[in-house]
């Protein structure tokens, strides 16, 4: 079984759906915590399950470097390796084309990238990316793409688009020769609408199980991100999942749902937690602030997470003040619980046709 998608309800452009995968059902819209190295930082699989995470994301390139494909084959895939029995989506390594630019070489065949671990060179092709993701055993595989950096010329964006389409075709062909894992195609096109249109036509003409919007939220202005998404999302098939790659702020998430997006991922909630920032229903809260030294309140009184049920702002501030890792753990639990709660409330609001009210509430505190 690869993937089955049901579109249960729409409210304006917002979509309430359900994805059936080999390791479970995913209710959408949904936020996916990022577990780059087969772990979500500072979280156990049990904790992830308890906060309501439905699906997590792993990074194919990093997992290919360490622990290596032989380890995944030995364990029978990532689910057994990390003891997470719910769905996993893997990024193809296309983002590393963008992020690991030093010493890279891009050809029609693939991308020569330096390992951030030891500087060794690796030629990543669409075929190798599929072999990696097949060995990892992810429920959703991403096609290998060229995520171009912001600010490139129209001419260079055309090259990136054409390589993305070529590599998408090769990714699909290779994966189908290996397994029936679900695979998503990725629409690129930088910040040019004519190229987004062309990319969407080319990628959606292929028999992918779902589609992603890539190459956005990579440093450009917010208005550009949203404008490109609102333009691109309607070009994707209604009967397949739509995934925006790299969105973790509550504001962006409600605006993406309002644009017709079903899935999103980001390291943002876990990263800001490690720096003392909590996400709450009344905006961001910096737990390091001196004003919380004598506070008995939880991070968020309306939150039902383990952290908010058991610990005060004063205690968590003390942990950060003393450099205790428990503070980072407790805030990570809270922030990911908040993201799951936000996703759940979004789903309920679409069912009840109250999504715009919820969106307005979020935008009031995350302007």
Curated annotation (Swiss-Prot):
Zn(2+) binds at residues 303, 305, 308, 334. Pathway: tRNA modification; tRNA-queuosine biosynthesis. It comes from Thermosipho africanus (strain TCF52B). GO terms for molecular function: metal ion binding; tRNA-guanosine(34) queuine transglycosylase activity. Belongs to the queuine tRNA-ribosyltransferase family. Its EC number is 2.4.2.29. It catalyses: 7-aminomethyl-7-carbaguanine + guanosine(34) in tRNA = 7-aminomethyl-7-carbaguanosine(34) in tRNA + guanine. Substrate binds at residues 91-95, 145, 188, 215. The active site is at 91 (proton acceptor), 265 (nucleophile). Residues 270-274 are annotated as: RNA binding. One of its GO terms (cellular component) is cytosol. Keywords: Glycosyltransferase, Metal-binding, Queuosine biosynthesis, Transferase, tRNA processing, Zinc. Homodimer. Within each dimer, one monomer is responsible for RNA recognition and catalysis, while the other monomer binds to the replacement base PreQ1. GO terms for biological process: queuosine biosynthetic process; tRNA wobble guanine modification; tRNA-guanine transglycosylation. This is Queuine tRNA-ribosyltransferase.
């Amino acid at each position: 079984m690869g993937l089955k998608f049901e579109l249960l309800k729409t409210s304006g452009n917002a979509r309430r759906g359900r994805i059936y995968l080999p390791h479970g059902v995913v209710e959408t819209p949904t936020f996916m915590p990022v577990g780059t190295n087969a772990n979500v930082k500072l979280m156990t699989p049990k904790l992830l399950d308890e906060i309501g995470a439905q699906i997590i994301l792993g990074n194919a390139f990093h997992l290919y470097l360490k622990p290596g494909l032989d380890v995944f084959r030995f364990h029978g895939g990532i689910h057994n390796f990390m003891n997470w029995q719910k769905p996993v989506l893997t990024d193809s390594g296309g983002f590393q084309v963008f992020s690991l630019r030093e010493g890279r070489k891009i050809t029609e065949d693939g991308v020569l990238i330096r390992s951030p671990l030891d500087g060794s060179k690796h030629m990543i092709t669409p075929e190798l990316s599929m072999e990696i993701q097949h060995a990892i055993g992810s429920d959703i595989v991403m096609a290998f793409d060229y995520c171009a950096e912001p600010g490139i010329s129209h001419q260079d964006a055309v090259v990136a688009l054409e390589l993305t389409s070529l590599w998408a075709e090769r990714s699909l062909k290779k994966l189908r020769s290996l397994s029936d894992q679900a695979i998503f195609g990725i629409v690129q096109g930088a910040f040019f609408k004519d190229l987004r249109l062309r990319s969407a036509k080319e990628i959606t003409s292929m028999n992918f199980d779902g589609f992603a919007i890539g190459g956005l939220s990579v440093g450009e202005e917010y208005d550009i991100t949203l404008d490109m998404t609102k333009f691109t999302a309607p070009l994707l098939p209604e009967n397949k999942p739509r995934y925006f790659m790299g969105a973790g702020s509550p504001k962006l998430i409600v605006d993406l749902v309002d644009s017709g997006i079903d899935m999103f991922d980001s390291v943002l909630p876990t990263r800001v937690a490690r720096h003392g920032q909590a996400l709450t229903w009344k905006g961001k809260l910096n737990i390091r602030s001196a004003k919380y030294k004598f506070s008995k309140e939880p991070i968020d009184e309306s939150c039902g997470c383990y952290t908010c049920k058991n610990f005060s702002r004063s205690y968590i501030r003390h942990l950060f003040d003393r450099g205790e890792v428990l503070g980072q753990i407790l805030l990570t639990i809270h922030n990911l619980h908040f993201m799951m709660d936000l996703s759940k409330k979004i789903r309920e609001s679409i069912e009840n046709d109250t999504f715009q009210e919820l969106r307005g509430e979020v935008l009031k505190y995350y302007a």
